[in-house]
């Protein structure tokens, strides 16, 4: 997933 919130793990 590119540009998805699911890849937003900070």
UniProtKB/Swiss-Prot annotation:
Expressed by the venom gland. One of its GO terms (molecular function) is toxin activity. It is found in: Secreted. Keywords: Blood coagulation cascade activating toxin, Disulfide bond, Fibrinogenolytic toxin, Hemostasis impairing toxin, Hydrolase, Protease, Secreted, Serine protease, Toxin. Strongly inhibited by PMSF. Not inhibited by EDTA, aprotinin, pepstatin, leupeptin, and bestatin. One of its GO terms (biological process) is proteolysis. GO terms for cellular component: extracellular region. The keyword Protease applies. Its EC number is 3.4.21.-. The keyword Secreted applies. Belongs to the peptidase S1 family. Snake venom subfamily. Monomer. Thrombin-like snake venom serine protease that coagulates human plasma and bovine fibrinogen by hydrolysis of the alpha chains (FGA) (minimum coagulation dose is 120 ug on fibrinogen). Has fibrinogenolytic activities, and degrades preferentially the Aalpha chain (FGA). Shows amidolytic activity toward N-benzoyl-L-Arg-p-nitroanilide, has a lower activity than Cdc SII. In vivo, intravenous injection induces defibrin(ogen)ation and a loss of the righting reflex and opisthotoxins, together with a typical gyroxin-like effect (18-20 minutes). Negative results: does not induce myotoxicity or hemorrhage, when injected intramuscularly. Is not lethal when administered either intravenously or intraperitoneally into mice (maximum dose tested is 20 ug). This is Thrombin-like enzyme Cdc SI. It comes from Crotalus durissus cumanensis.
